[in-house]
Amino acid sequence: PGGERYEDATSEIARRVDEGALIVNYIGHGGERGWAHERILNLETINAWTNLRRLPVFMTATCELFRYDDPDIYSAGEAILFNPQGGGVALLTTTRTVYSSGNQQVNRAFFETALDDTQGRRLGDIYRDTKNSEQITSHTNSRNFSLMGDPALELAYPAKHVYFTEVPDTMRSLDEVVIRGYVGNAKGDVLSEFDGVVVPTVFDKRASVTTLD
């Protein structure tokens, strides 16, 4: 089909999935066949994923991505879960039409529940607490979200954390800088027995970007 495409967005999604993102999140227009009118994610892209050892959890607040009860349609959500070479380990996603205001509530409640620094939380617990969140006022909308996957699975939270104790406030191109810190547990205690390599990622300053309508 014709229409504008965002090929860079499609490539970036595939790269993040392949690298093993913990959670892949999308909120916006979509349907049974994928995300967005520009088809930034579709069945062809999903079926090409080969991230079998690095399966993320998908949180998608978009219409009917996993309409599993229509035998005539193989939905994008089903393709993500059942891709034999990759895809996702589970999805908190939609089986029917949903609406933007309610989607934002569910999306925010999910992340506040999933990333509350509580180790060992199962997907079923996260799903339950998300659906019961006081933030959600549109319960008709939230009932169209379902957990597709094993509710006993835990998110792959890192057991070790990197804590910085000294970071320069300014970094310029080609500068040599010294950053100090330590590897610790979730409580901030130093893990003196740690023996490994820490790979830093440096981000540029925030920038505003305008995309096509």
Task: Label each PLM-derived region with a short phrase.
Residues 1-213:
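Cysteine-dependent hydrolase recognition
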